[in-house]
């Protein structure tokens, strides 16, 4: 079953004047998980950000955290998510565009795709409970502007 979802634009940019964005940890939908991931990054809560990934889907924690050493904040734009059901789980692919504001005052734009898996909660009967998790993420640097970049999982 494929289910197209509405395109969502999320600005998670935290300005110096307003401080860190409000805390968001929402695992209700695949889109919310990706938004929560970047909320954690904007708040420098890297362990929380890392926790949205399935075991083995992200680099070890030290490498993951150090990958954001030069990041001041990020902006996220989600494309249209597509979900497919399979034997007790739903896999959702979400295209993204990210603008990373760096500590030296420059920025970089990345395009890519996250794949998330939701195991049907009604079939989970042994700890630990598995919420929606990121099973894969692929980002590449883009030469397009944040506004012009087209989110795609192709």
What are these regions (language model features)?
Residues 11-16:
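N-terminal signal peptide c-region/cleavage motif recognized by signal peptidases
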Residues 17-26:
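Cleaved targeting-peptide boundary
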Residues 85-154:
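Exposed beta-sheet edge and beta->alpha loop/turn motif
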């Amino acid at each position: 079953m494929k289910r197209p979802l509405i395109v969502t634009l999320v600005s998670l940019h935290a300005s110096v004047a307003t401080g860190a964005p409000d805390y968001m940890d929402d695992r209700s939908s695949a889109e919310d998980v990706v938004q929560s991931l970047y909320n954690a990054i904007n708040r420098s809560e890297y362990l929380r950000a890392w926790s949205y990934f399935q075991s083995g889907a992200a680099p070890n924690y030290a490498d993951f955290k150090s990958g954001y050493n030069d990041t001041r904040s990020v902006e996220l734009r989600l494309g249209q998510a597509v979900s497919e059901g399979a034997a007790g789980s739903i896999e959702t692919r979400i295209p993204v565009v990210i603008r990373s504001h760096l500590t030296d005052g420059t920025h970089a734009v990345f395009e890519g795709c996250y794949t998330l898996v939701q195991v049907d909660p009604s079939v989970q009967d042994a700890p630990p409970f598995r919420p929606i998790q990121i099973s894969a993420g692929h980002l590449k640097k883009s030469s397009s502007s944040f506004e012009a970049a087209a989110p795609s999982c192709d």
